Amino acid sequence: MSADPTIRRELRPGDLGAIIAHHGRVYGEEYGVDATFEGHVASTVARAANRGFPSPGEAICLVELEGEHVGSLALTDEGNGEAAIRWFVLSAEVRGHGLGRRLLGEVLARAAEVGYTRVWLETFSELEAAAHLYRDYGFEVVSADAAPRWGLERITYQRYELELSKTPASLSA
């Protein structure tokens, strides 16, 4: 990595579109998903945007490298004391330096500070490095569904959950 990435914690016009496009590029190139995956991401982004994301208690982290969007991570309020980790993706050039771990730790600390009792996320099992990171923070797989989707013959969609009341006070795993 030639320069250090910067992290921006506020949305500007165009950022939500960049999150959607970045997911399509990264997961298309690395896992072979088709444009329907972008549609899936777009639907979650649209739901959040239409209700005013980010509201107090939510968070956005936008990662930029030399002015280019190279990653994102969000914490969204899902009601009933629950929050979701959404849109967590980093381009290859910024992986492997602890950035993902740091960002996840920050948003989980924020979730605990705000008073969420549970945090969940949805992903697919083929993202092995991400799964390792989630388990390090205490997330557990609560459901998995292997089926054709996003142009692939078979992909295992998973839901992870973390009960914040069972989490150590320090979320800096």
Task: Please annotate each region the language model reported.
Residues 97:
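Flexible nucleotide-binding loop
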Residues 39, 120-123, 128-131, 135-159:
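Conserved catalytic-core motifs of GNAT/GCN5-like acyltransferases
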Residues 111-123:
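Conserved GNAT acetyl-CoA-binding A-motif
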Residues 1-2:
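Short acidic N-proximal helix/loop "leader" segments that mark the beginning
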Residues 168-173:
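C-terminal end segment of the histidine kinase catalytic
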Residues 5-93, 101-106, 110, 114, ...:
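Acetyl-CoA-dependent GNAT
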